[in-house]
Design a protein with these regions (language model features):
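An alpha-helical, amphipathic repeat domain used for nucleic-acid recognition
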Residues: 1-150
């Protein structure tokens, strides 16, 4: 592949949805592009606005909060696995709307109870495990559960 073909192909890849730097590097490696050419392509993509890790972090967080109703812990882990710096993650994690976050926990509890019946002593551990797997902390779950009971 020529440099122009590579650039054209990777621009389409980035235009389809927001991509972080690591995703683009992985794609370029899968095409067996040399290290020096990878750096040049990445620089062009960043200059042209095809790659922007800050924009990626913002859209990732909003997508996981709104669509998947994930908790902060799972979002952080997902971003760290994509090679995003902890400082950048922390910068945008604090922008999460606390009311929406609490509503997401309540909605997850409601959905779980529709599938598994009311929360009882026997199945409360399963509920907590489910919510913690979605990335919520024990304290967050407990505070929402107490509000729901009162």
């Amino acid at each position: 592949m020529t440099s122009t073909e590579i650039l054209s192909k990777i621009e389409r890849y980035c235009a389809y949805q927001d991509r972080c730097t690591q995703e683009v590097v992985t794609k370029l490696r899968s095409w067996q592009i040399e290290e020096q050419e990878q750096r040049q392509v990445l620089q062009v993509l960043k200059n042209d606005g095809f790659i922007d890790d800050e924009r990626y972090v913002q859209s990732y967080i909003q997508g996981k909060i709104n669509a998947k109703q994930w908790g902060v812990q799972k979002i952080k882990l997902g971003l760290l696995q994509k090679g995003i710096s902890k400082n950048l993650i922390d910068k945008y994690i604090k922008d999460i709307n606390p009311e929406q976050y609490t509503d997401n926990i309540q909605a997850s509890i409601h959905k779980w109870t529709q599938n598994h019946g009311p929360v009882t002593q026997e199945n409360i551990i399963k509920l907590y495990r489910h919510l913690m797997a979605k990335g919520y902390t024990y304290e967050e779950i407990k505070s929402v559960e107490l509000k729901t009971e009162n």
